[in-house]
Amino acid sequence: MERIKELRNLMSQSRTREILTKTTVDHMAIIKKYTSGRQEKNPSLRMKWMMAMKYPITADKRITEMVPERNEQGQTLWSKMSDAGSDRVMVSPLAVTWWNRNGPMTSTVHYPKVYKTYFDKVERLKHGTFGPVHFRNQVKIRRRVDINPGHADLSAKEAQDVIMEVVFPNEVGARILTSESQLTITKEKKEELQDCKISPLMVAYMLERELVRKTRFLPVAGGTSSVYIEVLHLTQGTCWEQMYTPGGEVRNDDVDQSLIIAARNIVRRAAVSADPLASLLEMCHSTQIGGTRMMDILRQNPTEEQAVDICKAAMGLRISSSFSFGGFTFKRTSGSSIKREEEVLTGNLQTLKIRVHEGYEEFTMVGKRATAIIRKATRRLVQLIVSGRDEQSIAEAIIVAMVFSQEDCMIKAVRGDLNFVNRANQRLNPMHQLLRHFQKDAKVLFQNWGIEHIDNVMGMIGVLPDMTPSTEMSMRGIRVSKMGVDEYSSTERVVVSIDRFLRVRDQRGNVLLSPEEVSETQGTEKLTITYSSSMMWEINGPESVLVNTYQWIIRNWETVKIQWSQNPTMLYNKMEFEPFQSLVPKAIRGQYSGFVRTLFQQMRDVLGTFDTTQIIKLLPFAAAPPKQSRMQFSSLTVNVRGSGMRILVRGNSPVFNYNKTTKRLTILGKDAGTLIEDPDEGTSGVESAVLRGFLILGKEDRRYGPALSINELSNLAKGEKANVLIGQGDVVLVMKRKRDSSILTDSQTATKRIRMAIN
């Protein structure tokens, strides 16, 4: 207010007004500033001044033939004077208006296709909702953000090849289109842009916008997905923010979001399996996100998130050299340290072995809702400057920094025993033990930390153990700042190694990431994630495990059937039956398995007892390590829908229901697919129909290799012999007939011969 009064005062003196409005600008320094160099120093002024002239535009000479000298109002459209220094004509802005209204018309069909990104942006803005403007201090931190909504994720080189192929197909130069996305995009664009009259350079430029992710390092408070970044200038200023809901989503943001969810699910699941690294790779290879292979997305997508980076490390891709602890990304900005094992005692006199970092180091800490600068010496926090969205976020950052400092007072603040375990029931390492402990309750930690008097520093404020702000006192070495800490801007990637337990290390052996760092946050993916791996069946709960297990058996029935009769142990050990075991009550798993295996053995031994439906129904139970017992069961229990439900050994139940007439199998009322029983079940003599054109020679003969399924017989050449698995799970030797005429008689003789061959 004072300043405004002062200015008003000055302006009221007539001399001031005169100086400001009348004096010429003849100061040498000013003239120099505006005339030296080719760079325009004041583009908007230059534009206004140019447009005030009569002929500010130059055009090709041909314009004089295409545009009249005067328009209907008699205004001159172009000058007879040619432009100094070029053979172009000087043109009035009115000529542009005339051209737009009366110039030649061209087909507009390609415009929405070429300028797709612009048209889409207009649609998003049209349907977006702008809310109220709030005035408040904005804590902005610079983050690397995607500024180009709606792009594919090709590398610059891949995009260049696609653009050359689409826009300049006849140019020389080697172009290798290898990836699936490259080929699809090229084909699509070539069709769309047939007979396109828009200048090739413009098409190339617009294609680049569509194909490549462009990132900038920008100050952001709030949403970082590309549909928010495109309106950054409308939604946040230095002291204000405007609420905004985008009017549409773009695939690249959805891919980023879904990739993070898929990666988290996969890492969490892999961590609890017998061989985490092998499982993780198997799942990454067999997962699709929105119809694209996850492996392809990982190769192209620069998203940096703990789980995503673990997956990338497993694939041998480079990742950022920053490391993760407590959900914060740490980047060392100066100093160095050496690591040494040290034993420390907690407040509960429990011994912990920690790797102490000896030496002075400075780090930036960046999290979702808080950022900080941390300076530490050996087991001592020198200074922590933290900023965050709210008290809770600031507290989280302080806890992580205190644990990271490895200070003695932090370790002594532990009350009770530390025995936190990960998802696989293994003890966490000491640093994560401490972190979990204080994340649960940090009262003692803050209380014991110690407080100090503080100096009044602009933009900084103290924080007390109960998290209240103060200008006089603060926890030792800790200040809260109004300013955020920028994210690490470099896009440098380093070579890393990953061990069996998914711990990622840089080449100096520092651990950058581990499964403990993967967020437990659950979200709903924007794009469909298809996990083909049986390890992920349990992600949607017990029902999904049940349905998926039976669907898998039905899909692979032909091979399962052969294994069932010839190599049952291998079949029982298939990983696809692993998830199912969690549904079977632990105490009885072994007995069920022993019972089912015995039942199956009888089926193999006794002619005519083979029963497709029953084998499928009971097979998953045989996968557990069997306990030998004399127990017989008429029903088996599975834990779904929060309680035990029964599967009847003989007959249908709500869990497993097979309809003989429609051949449909329903699991818990959900359709699980069509089940074709073997033709011989229930009706003797039908094998012959299946074996038409084959002569049954006798019992199985191992020299002719493993048994084929009936479907595979069709590949035999005439006169070729093979073992074949017929209905009852029995194997006989057959030969494909040399002549087709005798096929009819096969039907009658086959039945007799099968009986003889088996008995």
From Swiss-Prot:
Subcellular location: Virion; Host nucleus; Host mitochondrion
Pfam families, alphabetized: Flu_PB2_1st, Flu_PB2_2nd, Flu_PB2_3rd, Flu_PB2_4th, Flu_PB2_5th, Flu_PB2_6th, Flu_PB2_7th
Sequence motif Nuclear localization signal, residues: 736-739
Signal peptide: none
GO BP field: 7-methylguanosine mRNA capping; cap snatching; DNA-templated transcription; symbiont-mediated suppression of host cytoplasmic pattern recognition receptor signaling pathway via inhibition of MAVS activity; symbiont-mediated suppression of host gene expression; symbiont-mediated suppression of host mRNA transcription via inhibition of RNA polymerase II activity; viral RNA genome replication
Key word Nucleotide-binding present: no
Keywords: Cap snatching, Eukaryotic host gene expression shutoff by virus, Eukaryotic host transcription shutoff by virus, Host gene expression shutoff by virus, Host mitochondrion, Host nucleus, Host-virus interaction, Inhibition of host innate immune response by virus, Inhibition of host MAVS by virus, Inhibition of host RLR pathway by virus, Inhibition of host RNA polymerase II by virus, mRNA capping, mRNA processing, Viral immunoevasion, Viral transcription, Virion
GO molecular function (one): RNA binding
Functional description taken from the UniProt entry: Plays an essential role in transcription initiation and cap-stealing mechanism, in which cellular capped pre-mRNAs are used to generate primers for viral transcription. Recognizes and binds the 7-methylguanosine-containing cap of the target pre-RNA which is subsequently cleaved after 10-13 nucleotides by the viral protein PA. Plays a role in the initiation of the viral genome replication and modulates the activity of the ribonucleoprotein (RNP) complex.
Name the record gives this protein: Polymerase basic protein 2
